[in-house]
Amino acid sequence: MSNTVRSLVIKTNVVKRIIKDVELAHIDINEAEKRVQSKIDNGEDSAEIEHQKFVLKKHLEALPDALVRLRNATNDLESISSDSAYEGTPELEQANEYLEKAKEVIEKEQTNFPTNGYH
């Protein structure tokens, strides 16, 4: 694999990983919200409830960070994938596939921006 193709593969894998990070951030947020509510419903110690709220806050802070990283990685991949050296390669096909997925994730998050409370 040439260095240029290797670079495309690396940047594609970065985008792929960050998409997973965004998905995991949503899962972590949902689970943390459930834990907080469960602690409240069970009348547990206020210190434990506050700790779980702190954990939830950290998960909420992770999502915008992942989205910024995804936007940056998407821009990097987009700029490198326009190189004519990659035309017709399976690596470019995969890069384009993940670019599309990344743009969908970013668009979905922007659409939810006013109501999701994460920004």
From Swiss-Prot:
Keywords: Chaperone, Cytoplasm, Cytoskeleton, Microtubule. One of its GO terms (biological process) is post-chaperonin tubulin folding pathway. InterPro entries: TBCA, TBCA_sf. The keyword Chaperone applies. It comes from the Eukaryota. Required for the maintenance of microtubule structures and cell polarity. Beta-tubulin-folding protein; may have a regulatory role in the tubulin-folding pathway. Belongs to the TBCA family. This is Tubulin-specific chaperone A.
